[in-house]
């Protein structure tokens, strides 16, 4: 059986077209992406436990990676962006609801974001996250940016939770909604944020209503990468809510972290019935599938024996506006596999 590949972006495009949310957005600001005049500012938001006050909306935001960039696009905030940083291994950007926003926004680099790039772009805010751009080992942190007068907004999925460098402080979909509301407040587009959240909540509820339940729920493992030790999702990364709300039993739900590594022996012990492959990078989804199928320790794992492998795009699985569509997509795949 070939891996199931479902274009979740098409599900998302359909949902946004029905609601009027997405690349084309109208709102009380007149639909031009600029904040309304008046007494909205200053505003205070809480981001990863830190309260920050802004006297005006940032005008030259630099985003890092596809999910973060598309959060801005989903809110219609491309006119507030100096550009984005993203490798070119994150799928077909021409097929997403925000293709026009991609075309009008500068792709600053396909390599790693850094302080020099932010300075060259004259950024007033960098929207990234821990291990989504910010990294002490590389010397690129919010504290370093603050020294040169550049603000930061941390992706909520990446918030550190006090256990060393473990990440995650709330359920993944809640993290998405928190960021939409925070950015809605910061850029004075609260109505847009609430409309998107309502659309996503409706989409998730409809998918859950059709999802497998009870004893029919298959055990599901998310495979990102890695041969010696697999990189996977814990309870605080997007796949946890995507798998759970799609009608699966996430086998790594007890890991109180976001993206993390485990041992293959743990995977074998938990015997997933379905494996979801995260499709991105230099190693293709088919190459990942062939590795899983040929790796001797996995030979007796149910998902491998029955060839139950699903493929989702990277942007479906990290925190992004594509998460609700990925739930609907995976729910349909799980029903098909169980049928």
Q: PLM features: what roles do these ranges have?
A:
Residues 90-92, 132-140, 150-182, 215-238, ...:
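Extracytoplasmic ligand-binding site segments that recognize negatively charged/polar headgroups
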Residues 1-71, 182-222, 333-339:
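Bacterial Sec-exported substrate-binding components of ABC uptake systems
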